[in-house]
Amino acid sequence: MGSSIKINSISIDLAGAANEIDMVKCDHFSMRGFVAETRERDLRKCWPFSEESVSLVDQQSYTLPTLSVPKFRWWHCMSCIKDIDAHGPKDCGLHSNSKAIGNSSVIESKSKFNSLTIIDHEKEKKTDIADNAIEEKVGVNCENDDQTATTFLKKARGRPMGASNVRSKSRKLVSPEQVGNNRSKEKLNKPSMDISSWKEKQNVDQAVTTFGSSEIAGVVEDTPPKATKNHKGIRGLMECDNGSSESINLAMSGLQRRKSRKVRLLSELLGNTKTSGGSNIRKEESALKKESVRGRKRKLLPENNYVSRILSTMGATSENASKSCDSDQGNSESTDSGFDRTPFKGKQRNRRFQVVDEFVPSLPCETSQEGIKEHDADPSKRSTPAHSLFTGNDSVPCPPGTQRTERKLSLPKKKTKKPVIDNGKSTVISFSNGIDGSQVNSHTGPSMNTVSQTRDLLNGKRVGGLFDNRLASDGYFRKYLSQVNDKPITSLHLQDNDYVRSRDAEPNCLRDFSSSSKSSSGGWLRTGVDIVDFRNNNHNTNRSSFSNLKLRYPPSSTEVADLSRVLQKDASGADRKGKTVMVQEHHGAPRSQSHDRKETTTEEQNNDDIPMEIVELMAKNQYERCLPDKEEDVSNKQPSQETAHKSKNALLIDLNETYDNGISLEDNNTSRPPKPCSSNARREEHFPMGRQQNSHDFFPISQPYVPSPFGIFPPTQENRASSIRFSGHNCQWLGNLPTVGNQNPSPSSFRVLRACDTCQSVPNQYREASHPIWPSSMIPPQSQYKPVSLNINQSTNPGTLSQASNNENTWNLNFVAANGKQKCGPNPEFSFGCKHAAGVSSSSSRPIDNFSSESSIPALHLLSLLDPRLRSTTPADQHGNTKFTKRHFPPANQSKEFIELQTGDSSKSAYSTKQIPFDLYSKRFTQEPSRKSFPITPPIGTSSLSFQNASWSPHHQEKKTKRKDTFAPVYNTHEKPVFASSNDQAKFQLLGASNSMMLPLKFHMTDKEKKQKRKAESCNNNASAGPVKNSSGPIVCSVNRNPADFTIPEPGNVYMLTGEHLKVRKRTTFKKKPAVCKQDAMKQTKKPVCPPTQNA
């Protein structure tokens, strides 16, 4: 009779225990089981230990004092029992009248029985407990078991603890190892002994009653499936939790120990025993009900409550069944009928067997059944609920994907996997590790598959680090639907083994993409979710048709760069290993698959060429810029197969940030101008990109169809191969860009295009990036300018640019003169896609076609343009400082004005010096190679500007400074920008600016400042020729504006200063006080001279 008193802490008074009898102490003593028993028998026993008990511990060096036999029950683990068997019952301290209960008291656990048995002093009676396993088939009725328990324990309370209780715990604790034990199988498979015969065999009743607490106690690590025990013993077992089992395991090294549950309060334990009676034995139906109730406690989809309850019951029963079915059907029955007995299910949940309604990522029913059957020796022997659920008999009405996989799958890993149910239809992309191409199960019924993860992904909960980093590391990127034959592709087209089953989706499928019910392939996706092109570095599963649907709802869809992929990751394995491994597991096959496809071979070549490092840098820069609209479309730039792995190893960018505003990830193959999209594509709004046979870029459709969160997309152009069409104009692309002439550009030839401020030039890394989409730049740069391509070092002919592009290692700065957009030749150092300064006409406050030409802008150069101070949202000067927003980059025809360098802006020049590299094309002084003598040297820093001319000397620099025709802002050691006058536009030009644009207006200095600069330079000329040289016409000005840029500091680099610069700056500070300095020097010299004279 359980006490109504709730005990939060238990202590046992063993006063005088040492005096009563010789005892054998067990290190594995279960305090919990003991207290449960003693608490039942005598509430007074539960008191703090006395000092005498402490002395016992000291004497025999046991962690816990043993209990005196007359008053307390013996608790032994297997090792203790073995020792008792070896030494005889007297060692146990048992009374002579006690009979060997070893035959009956066997409790099975993991091929060994961790049961405490009172061994009779007669050694012939003692037998191995495992050999003496309770040989009753689970088929024995609970009533019989109860009877046996009652008869077996007469002295126990009026109601014996039913075997169902044992079974309940055993069901919780039964593990495949336990049941899998051959001996247990043999024993369990044996026909159950008659209760009468068993009683006869167990003639221990009186012996047990002779001393109240010496009843059999099965302190089992994992309580056996079914053992008739004293109700007290059972209560002890029930209440022991794993305290005893853990302690027992300490001795049982051979056994695999598991924690079954958290430790419950004794009050709960007592309350459990209190309510548990041997007579009221619950059948499996009751067990199912209880478990279902327990299942209801879990979070469930509203429509899935019933199914989830069944599944929960199944989860527990089927798991136990699956684990116990190997050994015997009876075990499963016992396990099923048990565990419900505990009234406090909520707290009693076995953590290991917790029935969770979070569903296993929906493996196909077949796979789930197989997974279960793997551990279920005979599914037909399962308990009815589990059996019905898996075998189809009495099948619970649940969608096929909802069936549970093995319970081995770690629940905490499963918790994030609930099916997304949209309009009652969810497509589950589920694939087991063995399945090469994941099967997509579209279920019209409520699908229990990987809901939580997709929700979280869609909600952006889990996307932040794990998902995005994983995507980034794995090279997953969102890709626009490529429009083949101007037919919008609304469904993911799978390769042979693609992860999503392609369906002929209606054009309006994306339109209604918010409701996943319309697209079977994307059904599991939430509204606004893109179907993402799942492409690893080597497996570009993307076809021309492999569509990355543009996110219609950026907030939810932003993090779902590869939601389907991620879901696959989750679905592939119920555990995180599956998730983590998913990418890896599926890398190889998809990669080969993508390469196997002819359609994607060209895309693969181009898409793979783009390294993730660029994306990472851009994301990092974007983050540092703290732009509210972090819409850097560091879009699905899949690292080239070669560079992808490197990029994985490279910085992992949080794609969540890069995708923060739901920026559609654009395929890196943006190098080609978008092909006009069909009306269907417009209707669908998934922005299928027109696709050129060899062109590798997918461009979004023209601005009218671009969602507002997504930046402007250049209008589609028909003549894409040789030139970029910006806003419907023939804006030539960079010579070496893949769209120009490179059918198969190397990854280095690509650069990520971004807002002008992001433009940076990093040597040897080029990437045509998807257009950086800036919400502020949403205005389509249509028909503002018709760029005329200038090929400074090469012919202005766009064809020549494309030819020049063939040599990726020899980029020459090519500028589109009309737009002032710079066309970078293949020379990787100076490949700049900066179009900002030149692109913006004075009339328009924003760069022309910032995004239209972004595809042509090298990614690293774009990164170099990143300035954390600058905000991309500034309308005039997205890439520049807001204070420059009013500044307009004059069109090509205004190049003279730039040359003249209006002095009105000199007041801002000090700031502009920092901004100079950014304000031009991308607020960065981009150097335009002199057509002949201008040596193009790769700037060490990605964002560093390098202005170098063939030869330059301080004298030349002085001459330049004296000239007033044009002042090029040079990063002198002075804090203020030094504008070196130069008559040769070609010699000194801003990188990213066309010939027409020498400098932004803001860099113009007032005459006064010019004079000051000249004076400063003259002062420093003699002292430090280096900084003065920087102001010379052939200037080497390398400024690293990109905080993400990790490069060697170069002269003139504002952020990366060398010691030389520091020295110069110090001198410059004193340059205006030469006389004072002289006086000070003289004074100092006089002072030291005086003391020696005095001393003399």
UniProtKB/Swiss-Prot annotation:
Keywords: DNA-binding, Nucleus, Repeat, Repressor, RNA-binding
Composition-biased stretches (Basic and acidic residues): 281-294, 371-381, 572-601
Domain of life, source organism: Eukaryota
UniProt feature, compositional bias: Polar residues: 315-337, 382-394, 1018-1032
Key word Nucleus present: yes
Annotated spans, DNA-binding: 337-617, 866-1096
Motif (Nuclear localization signal 1): 170-177
Gene Ontology annotations of biological process type: epigenetic regulation of gene expression; hyperosmotic salinity response; meristem determinacy; negative regulation of DNA-templated transcription; negative regulation of flower development; negative regulation of gene expression, epigenetic; post-embryonic development; regulation of flower development
Ranges where the record places region Disordered: 155-189, 274-296, 315-348, 366-420, 563-612, 629-651, 1007-1032, 1070-1096
GO MF terms, alphabetically ordered: double-stranded DNA binding; RNA binding; single-stranded DNA binding
Tissue: Expressed in mature embryo, root tips, cotyledons, leaves, stems, shoot apex, and flower clusters, with highest levels in flowers. The presence in the shoot apical meristem (SAM) is required to maintain vegetative development and prevent early flowering.
Main location group: nucleus
Position of sequence motif Nuclear localization signal 3: 1071-1078
Motif Nuclear localization signal 2 positions after renumbering to this chain: 281-288
Annotated GO CC locations: nucleus
Subunit structure and binding partners: Interacts with MSI1.
Protein name in the entry: Protein EMBRYONIC FLOWER 1
Source organism (scientific name): Arabidopsis thaliana (Mouse-ear cress)
